[in-house]
């Protein structure tokens, strides 16, 4: 098989190709004349067309892809187009013996960072999901390593599969998280990757983002549905494995998203709270505060008289920590105060929060004003953030309800206001927003 068949030798592009071939000093170290005498590459002159032609004809197996690769290296789009017209196979990988790996021309173009060349190769049929590369990286993996968002979007729009793992078990978005590339993560999330594919350690994208302490990326992943209680190979949940290694604010985010503070790792014989205490002694920090408050709150909402077996197993250990028990008592005291203080409609502050946990937003909306007046935030320092969270939910719900009810009251005059209000309460926030 000839790289350049005889029928195209006389095309006007031949001299351009030959000149380029010599000019770039391709990977050939020696060339041979008729007598098989080696001549150094530097002795070849631009007019030695016959010599170069013989070289190409005598080594046709991989010269086409080599010339194409060199054209990509020098970003010669004119040469690339000519080679593609001649039928050079864009999916033929060039093997590098010293690296024991292959490298497609699409990988190479992505590595160089030339979007136009990448686009040309994709149009010519280059495999966008080619994994014949170092560590079985796809072109998308490389684009993310280069932090090239334009090429990443081009590959995604061309059908790049975000769920292909490399030899380390990393899908492309794992690479973006490792590089703390928030912009790239944002782009990748728009194409709906599977966030639960784990790497070789069994860690999901969220798991690694939490350990990397990147608050913004953690928030993005949570907003896009990443599971908060996935487990790694060792059987640790995200909360358990990161509680003593990440930012305290991230711990709070995980807890607010429903991370289980009671998860017991049998091998460790710890739940997140006791594991944190074990690692940090009796230090009292925001992390301990959030863990205890969430644990106590959940235990009361679920009508649990005592803590879960995870705490019981470590009871002797936890009871020996004075500051831990002191803070635990503060949490429980605030719970008792919440059960006493009324927020209106015969509901206590605790009932209000419990309603929020159950997504009963109508209850929140009905007593929101009295709650705002009646709650003394100085008395609820520990659970202040939780109360504020549901106040925002209640305010938004009430705003939507009032707007729609007032609108309907002006047109429906034969029904009492309260009846209209009850009817409107049956609607979801999305349905309310659609009514103008």
Curated annotation (Swiss-Prot):
- Domain (F-box): residue spans on this chain: 409-436
The ANK repeats extend over 63-92, 101-130, 135-164, 168-197, 201-230, 234-266
SUPFAM superfamilies named in the record: Ankyrin repeat
What the entry lists under InterPro entries is as follows:
Ankyrin_rpt, Ankyrin_rpt-contain_sf, F-box_dom, PRANC_domain
Q: Is Repeat there in the keyword field?
A: yes
Asked if the record carries the keyword Repeat, the reply is yes
Q: Which UniProt keywords apply?
A: ANK repeat, Repeat
PANTHER family found in the cross-reference section? ANKYRIN REPEAT AND PROTEIN KINASE DOMAIN-CONTAINING PROTEIN (PTHR24198), ANKYRIN REPEAT-CONTAINING PROTEIN-RELATED (PTHR24198:SF165)
The entry's protein name is Putative ankyrin repeat protein FPV026
């Amino acid at each position: 098989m000839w790289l350049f068949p005889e029928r195209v030798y006389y095309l006007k592009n031949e001299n351009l190709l030959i000149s380029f071939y010599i000019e770039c000093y391709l990977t050939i170290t020696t060339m041979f004349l008729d007598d098989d005498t080696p001549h150094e590459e530097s002795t070849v002159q631009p007019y030695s067309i016959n010599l170069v032609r013989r070289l190409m004809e005598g080594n046709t197996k991989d010269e086409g892809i080599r010339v194409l690769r060199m054209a990509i290296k020098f970003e010669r789009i004119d040469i690339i187009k000519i080679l593609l017209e001649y039928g050079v196979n864009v999916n033929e990988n060039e093997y590098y013996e010293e690296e024991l790996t292959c490298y497609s021309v699409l990988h190479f173009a992505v590595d160089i960072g030339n979007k136009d060349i990448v686009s040309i190769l994709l149009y010519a049929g280059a495999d966008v999901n080619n994994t014949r590369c170092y560590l079985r990286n796809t072109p998308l993996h490389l684009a993310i390593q280069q932090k090239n968002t334009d090429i990443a979007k081009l590959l995604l729009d061309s059908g790049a599969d975000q769920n292909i793992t490399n030899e380390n078990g990393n899908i492309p978005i794992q690479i973006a998280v490792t590089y703390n590339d928030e912009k790239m993560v944002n782009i990748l999330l728009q194409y709906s990757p599977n966030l639960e594919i784990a790497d070789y350690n069994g860690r999901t994208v969220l798991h690694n983002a939490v350990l990397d302490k990147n608050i913004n990326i953690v928030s993005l992943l949570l907003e896009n549905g990443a599971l908060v209680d996935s487990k790694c190979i060792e059987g640790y949940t995200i909360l358990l494995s990161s509680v003593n290694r990440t930012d305290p604010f991230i711990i709070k985010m995980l807890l607010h998203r429903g991370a289980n503070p009671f998860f017991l790792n049998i091998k460790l014989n710890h739940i997140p709270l006791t594991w944190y205490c074990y690692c940090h002694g009796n230090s009292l920090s925001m992390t301990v505060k959030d863990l205890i408050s969430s644990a106590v709150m959940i235990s009361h909402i679920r009508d649990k008289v005592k803590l879960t077996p995870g705490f019981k197993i470590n009871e002797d250990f936890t009871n020996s920590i004075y500051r831990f028990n002191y803070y635990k008592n503060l949490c429980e005291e605030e719970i008792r105060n919440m059960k006493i203080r009324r927020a209106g409609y015969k509901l206590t502050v605790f009932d209000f929060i419990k309603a929020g946990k159950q997504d009963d937003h109508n209850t929140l909306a009905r007593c929101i004003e009295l709650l705002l007046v009646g709650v003394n935030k100085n008395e609820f320092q520990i659970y202040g953030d939780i109360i504020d969270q549901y106040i925002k939910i209640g305010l938004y719900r009430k705003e939507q309800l009032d707007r729609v009810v007032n609108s309907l009251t002006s047109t429906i005059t034969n029904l009492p206001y309260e009846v209209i209000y009850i009817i409107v309460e049956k609607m979801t926030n999305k349905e309310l927003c659609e009514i103008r």
